[in-house]
Amino acid sequence: MSAELNVPMDPSAPACPEPGHKGMDYRDWVRRSYLELVTSNHHSVQALSWRKLYLSRAKLKASSRTSALLSGFAMVAMVEVQLETKYQYPQPLLIAFSACTTVLVAVHLFALLISTCILPNVEAVSNIHNLNSISESPHERMHPYIELAWGFSTVLGILLFLAEVVLLCWIKFLPVDAKDQPGSHSHTGWQAALVSTIIMVPVGLIFVVFTIHFYRSLVRHKTERHNREIEELHKLKVQLDGHERSLQVV
């Protein structure tokens, strides 16, 4: 080691290669710069893939929890609701309640099925601490199904749940005091059901407006992020083209 440190050096030779010098030193610098750019781009692509993986896993978890909760509530509501046998319910009300409950349970069970089938495979890959294991995850190929489960669980499923609550209020409160005032729409039960409907309609409208606004904001964010990525790729291309022209000059 001491012999290596005591080797005399030519003062005319540079201590380290600089990009301004011609010859092999300049080519080595260009090659090293090219490898650094390619490596950084490769890591950026892997980071984007892992970000998509974690986003898909979060969506599947939220979809499964929401679907299990709301479908269970709908089933309990249908089983536990007690119809007044002495009261003649309007036929459209019973048909609407039955159809809404069935569609609600079917939609949430379908979303739960998708989440249950895909989530274990995504979890298995996300728990492996290896950057190259991202290619084994099915989240890219199953992306349409993940978005479908997310939409069914959070958008369509919640709208059906709000309609279920309104119909349940009508079935529960409509027979109240109906015997004292037959054929009248001013008894206590009818007024209670009407109040629940009046409250739930603006809530549903607010939910729809918020969903549209959130979706547009999310699309705008993704568009801006993709534009930044395109600009970075363009800068990378310009740098690589400049290095290639420099090599041709050399």
Swiss-Prot record:
Gene3D superfamilies in UniProt: Calcium release-activated calcium channel protein Orai (1.20.140.140)
Reactions performed catalytically: Ca(2+)(in) = Ca(2+)(out)
GO BP annotation list: store-operated calcium entry
Domain of life: Eukaryota
Transmembrane segments: 66-83, 94-114, 148-168, 192-212
Record-level GO cellular component terms: membrane; plasma membrane
Its membrane topology: Multi-pass membrane protein
Gene Ontology molecular function terms on file: store-operated calcium channel activity
Regulation affecting activity: CRAC channels are regulated by fast Ca(2+)-dependent inactivation (FCDI), a mechanism that limits Ca(2+) influx and cell toxicity. ORAI2 channels display prominent FCDI. Inhibited by lanthanides such as Gd(3+) ions.
Family: Belongs to the Orai family.
Assembly with partners or alone: Oligomerizes in homomeric and heteromeric ORAI complexes. Native CRAC channels most likely consist of hexameric ORAI heteromers, implying that diverse ORAI1, ORAI2 and ORAI3 subunit combinations with distinct biophysical properties can operate in a cell-type specific way. Interacts with STIM1; this regulates channel activity. Interacts with CRACR2A/EFCAB4B.
Name recorded for this polypeptide: Protein orai-2
Organism: Mus musculus
Source lineage: Eukaryota, Metazoa, Chordata, Craniata, Vertebrata
